[in-house]
Amino acid sequence: MKEIHVILSGGLSRRFGEPKAFARWKGKPLYQWCKQALGDDVLILSRPGLTERFIELGEKAVLEDIEPYRGKGPLAGMYTAMERAEGECYIFSACDTPLVRQETISALKRQLTPADDAVVPVADGRAQPLVAVYHRRVKSVLHEQLQQNELKISSFLDRIRVKYIEADAVGAEPWEFINVNKKSDLEEIEPFFPG
């Protein structure tokens, strides 16, 4: 099964005050921690104004959301990845989850069966749909949702066959799924840094 690894980094980062993807933590931009978990061969979903910065940092595969869905949130990024990069299995990580480990990503991929449209981890009782694995067949549902301007990821998940799996069932720690929304969050995740 051909896998496409995708970092979602097209958000506006309003609460953070600057593009989160490039915020430096432990010597490198946040998105590079996600890349470390996904592997070097990643597709980065960006937005106008940020694409050039990724290219300047040496990234080769950087896309912006397809018009007319630009600025429509993570569903647009997921759809764009599936529309522009041919694969069967898409592994997504939001750029603001720097603690996710490579072992966790590998374990989530192994959970996807032919009966599943997606594998979504659950940490501390909350689904984590932006650090998850999706089969290509969900692309049509993404398209329908975008066409109807129904941008809630929970609505999308309700329409597909999701295998929800507790983080500890795949050897993951709940803290791996903490996302950075404010600059102060960088200090709060410090105790969980494995290095």
Curated annotation (Swiss-Prot):
GO molecular function: GTP binding; metal ion binding; molybdenum cofactor guanylyltransferase activity
EC assignment: 2.7.7.77
Localization, UniProt: Cytoplasm
Gene3D superfamilies reported in the protein's UniProt record: Spore Coat Polysaccharide Biosynthesis Protein SpsA, Chain A
Cofactor(s) it depends on: Mg(2+)
Any GO CC annotation of this UniProt entry: cytoplasm
Keyword Lyase appears in the UniProt entry: no
InterPro entries xref list: MobA-like_NTP_Trfase, Molybde_CF_guanTrfase, Nucleotide-diphossugar_trans
Reaction catalysis annotation: Mo-molybdopterin + GTP + H(+) = Mo-molybdopterin guanine dinucleotide + diphosphate
Record-level GO BP terms: Mo-molybdopterin cofactor biosynthetic process
Sorted UniProt keywords: Cytoplasm, GTP-binding, Magnesium, Metal-binding, Molybdenum cofactor biosynthesis, Nucleotide-binding, Transferase
Residues noted as binding GTP in the record, renumbered to the chain: L8, S9, G10, K20, D65, D96
Chain positions recorded as Mg(2+) binding sites: D96
Role noted for this protein: Transfers a GMP moiety from GTP to Mo-molybdopterin (Mo-MPT) cofactor (Moco or molybdenum cofactor) to form Mo-molybdopterin guanine dinucleotide (Mo-MGD) cofactor.
UniProt protein name: Probable molybdenum cofactor guanylyltransferase
